[in-house]
């Protein structure tokens, strides 16, 4: 049985491959700063996409989507602002979620614009 850290890493790898198959480009994985961590930073055209990857083996407590709380969203938006501050130029950006849920880990749901900064 794999540990939670390995499962998270496996889920991020699965999400990366899935998004690359959708023609997105990986910019960074596991970006960390004092505000938090962003699982994946991708690019689609000119748009920078901050991706939160969630895996849940069961929907018992609301599933993967329910685990992206308002507090988590705030951390992600702060970390995204920190990342963008280090970039030259002004880029459109959005927050997406990749949800891997259920007993079969090959089920992937991609939610574009999963949340905004409000």
From Swiss-Prot:
This is UPF0102 protein NE0711. Signal peptide: none annotated. Pfam families: UPF0102. Disulfide bonds: none annotated. InterPro entries: Restrct_endonuc-II-like (IPR011335), tRNA_endonuc-like_dom_sf (IPR011856), UPF0102_YraN-like (IPR003509). It comes from Nitrosomonas europaea (strain ATCC 19718 / CIP 103999 / KCTC 2705 / NBRC 14298). GO terms for molecular function: nucleic acid binding. Coiled coil: none annotated. Belongs to the UPF0102 family.
